[in-house]
């Protein structure tokens, strides 16, 4: 379990209650601290992600990394079920990303394998292979599901200014040149062989897209505050 400490300003009045909860806009630092934007000091803290969703009975607390992934394909080829859930309501991006990393299609036999021996002989998920590269206190980054990107979209007015303050790249909300469209880790349930869901950060809408198309992605991380 990830152990975190929350940096807070001392209350001006000893009778004033101190808020120990973690809220959207708080900053996850490389040393495991979660700090309020009001006490964040770039000379002291190294930011890695910004919180966009508090923990509840349906999902862990979630934070979005400061920078995004350049346009990349969901899959190398079509006609390839990559074993994601296909759910538009589950907060299961981590499980989906594991499926993307471990499900491969043999280029010769076109048989799906759970593990690959030589990546040159298998179709894979270029998107999925970009996840799990960063680790902070045993937590790994992954591609969010449809539902998780919905949470991020709802918090953008709070999160984007903090990302910018931390020196990161704000989530793109401009529809120009399809810049607002981001991959989810969720295949379209009715057509998992060929399509996955895109999410628009301009208006919160969703769109089915061929998995071989290239779009941006934004990785997230979850953690378990005590």
Can you describe what each PLM-predicted range is?
Residues 1-12:
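Sec-dependent bacterial lipoprotein signal peptides
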Residues 10-11, 42-49, 161-167, 199-202:
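Short amphipathic alpha-helical surface micro-motifs
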Residues 15-19, 82-85, 171-226:
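Terminal interaction module
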Residues 116-142, 146-201:
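An exposed tryptophan-centered "aromatic clamp" motif
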């Amino acid at each position: 379990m990830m152990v975190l400490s929350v940096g807070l300003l001392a209350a001006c009045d000893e009778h004033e209650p101190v808020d120990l909860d973690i809220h959207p806009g708080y900053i996850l630092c490389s040393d495991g601290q979660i700090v309020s934007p009001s006490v964040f000091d770039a000379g002291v803290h190294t930011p890695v992600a910004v919180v966009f969703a508090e923990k509840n009975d349906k999902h862990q607390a979630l934070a979005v990394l400061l920078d995004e992934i350049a346009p990349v394909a969901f899959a190398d080829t079509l006609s390839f079920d990559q074993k994601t859930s296909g759910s538009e309501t589950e907060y299961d991006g981590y499980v989906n990303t594991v499926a993307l990393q471990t499900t491969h299609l043999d280029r010769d036999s076109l048989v799906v394998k759970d593990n690959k021996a030589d990546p040159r002989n298998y179709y894979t998920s270029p998107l999925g292979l970009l996840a799990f590269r960063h680790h902070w206190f045993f937590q790994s980054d992954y591609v969010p599901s449809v539902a998780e990107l919905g949470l991020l979209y709802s918090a953008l007015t709070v999160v984007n200014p903090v990302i910018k303050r931390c020196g990161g790249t704000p989530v793109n909300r401009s529809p120009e040149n399809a810049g607002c469209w981001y991959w989810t880790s969720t295949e379209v349930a009715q057509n998992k062989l060929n399509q996955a869901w895109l999410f628009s950060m301009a208006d919160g809408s969703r769109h089915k897209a061929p998995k071989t198309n290239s779009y941006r992605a934004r990785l997230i991380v979850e953690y378990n505050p005590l």
